[in-house]
Regions:
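N-terminal signal peptide c-region/cleavage motif recognized by signal peptidases
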Residues: 15-17
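Sec-dependent signal peptide recognition
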Residues: 2-10
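Cysteine-centric segments in proteins
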Residues: 21-111
Length: 111
């Protein structure tokens, strides 16, 4: 079993409520980077667990004008994952300045 699969299973055990439905997807982003994501839409709030830069990142659903936006509800800095119409992007949200720095801008689900 690969390290990535083990990490995803651990994330699910930690993040998902008992009996919650999950959806696992891997996105192919710019520069050829793969981003595995496990969505837990039945959690309250809904969550996404991403494996990026060698770490598991747990994000919660956030208000968005369109699409599904995940971040961390605080005044500090955090990753932000935004999925809209089959595409996604990952950025770093700087809490103090409210600036968004793109990390991966064109992520599409792998077949």
């Amino acid at each position: 079993m690969s390290t990535l699969v083990r990490a995803a299973l651990c994330a699910l055990l930690w993040a998902a409520p008992a009996g919650a439905e999950t959806t696992a997807m891997t996105y192919l982003c710019d520069r050829g980077v793969s981003v595995p994501v496990v969505y837990v839409p039945d959690a309250d709030p809904a969550i996404a667990v991403l494996y990026i830069e060698g770490r598991l990142i747990h994000l919660q659903t956030m208000p968005s004008g369109s699409g599904a936006r995940y971040g961390w509800p605080s005044d500090g800095s955090s990753y932000e994952w935004w999925e809209h119409q089959g595409r996604a992007r990952l950025g770093w949200h700087e809490g103090a300045s409210d600036a968004m720095t793109p990390i991966y801008t064109d992520c599409v689900p792998q077949d």
